[in-house]
């Protein structure tokens, strides 16, 4: 498959400490394709909005009036994307944009409609952090696989890449407003029988002191989302 343009969708919520660094890395990431960078501010209350305004003259910047959640921000960004491939990029420096070229390979070769960047199937370095997070991720991924019939190793990864056609198919079905979007994306990928590949990626996880936002309540909510989006939502 030929990829002339890559859309990079970046949801932002209170990331003033890392935002400039992430955007610099995204802009410098080595891609032969044209980049379309789409940033969605999800009602930030720090200086993130002011920082994003500095980039508004050269990239797409969307400002939500209030905090609506990652799912809402991503859905808005997906709707604006015009690239042949669409990459999700968090604004927290946990994931390295230099790896875009690796993530795109299965699509370029015509083997995949969707690519997940896995933090567990990798020869790249990754920061060792909380066992509780690892256990929660593995448990949620196992439960998701049980419902979807897929064999994904890292459902909660930020790095998910979609062909334009794949996103066109699943976007009308997406409803999640917050972190449930990770579960819903995987459920819709399975419902639409899209071809999924995994690529190993590096990972530099944050501590709560660094600004990590997800917590045990999100884990419990994810269990409900797995049941909801797999049993009670149509594809």
Enumerate the language-model features and the residues they cover.
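Conserved donor nucleotide-binding strand/loop of the catalytic core
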Residues: 35-38, 49-80
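Acceptor/aglycone-binding surface of glycosyltransferases and processive sugar-polymer synthases
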Residues: 64-80, 85, 97-179, 204-216, ...
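Short, well-formed alpha-helical segments that are part of the catalytic scaffolds
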Residues: 15-29
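Hydrophobic helical membrane-anchoring modules
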Residues: 1-6, 17, 147-150, 173-235
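Short loop->beta transition adjacent to catalytic acidic/histidine clusters or analogous donor-positioning motifs
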Residues: 3-6, 27-38, 47, 59-60
């Amino acid at each position: 498959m030929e990829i002339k343009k890559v859309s990079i969708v970046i949801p932002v919520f209170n990331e003033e400490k890392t935002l400039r660094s992430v955007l610099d890395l995204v802009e410098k990431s080595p891609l032969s394709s044209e980049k379309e960078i789409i940033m969605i501010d999800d009602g930030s209350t720090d200086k993130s909005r002011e920082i994003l305004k500095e980039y508004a003259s050269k990239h797409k910047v969307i400002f939500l009036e209030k905090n609506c959640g990652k799912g809402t921000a991503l859905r808005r960004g997906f709707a604006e994307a015009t690239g042949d491939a669409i990459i999700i990029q968090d604004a927290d420096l946990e994931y390295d944009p230099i790896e875009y070229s690796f993530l795109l390979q299965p699509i370029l070769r015509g083997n995949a409609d969707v690519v997940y960047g896995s933090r567990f199937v990798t020869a790249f370095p990754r920061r060792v952090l909380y066992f509780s997070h690892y256990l929660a991720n593995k448990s949620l991924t196992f439960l998701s696989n049980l419902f979807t019939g897929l064999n994904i190793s890292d459902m909660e990864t930020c790095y998910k890449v979609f062909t334009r056609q794949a996103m066109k198919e699943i976007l009308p079905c997406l409803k999640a407003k917050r972190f449930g979007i990770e579960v819903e994306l995987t459920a819709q990928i399975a419902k639409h029988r899209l071809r999924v590949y995994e690529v190993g990626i590096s990972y530099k996880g944050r501590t709560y002191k660094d600004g990590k936002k997800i917590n045990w309540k999100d884990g419990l909510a994810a269990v409900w989302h797995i049941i909801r989006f797999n049993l009670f939502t149509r594809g």
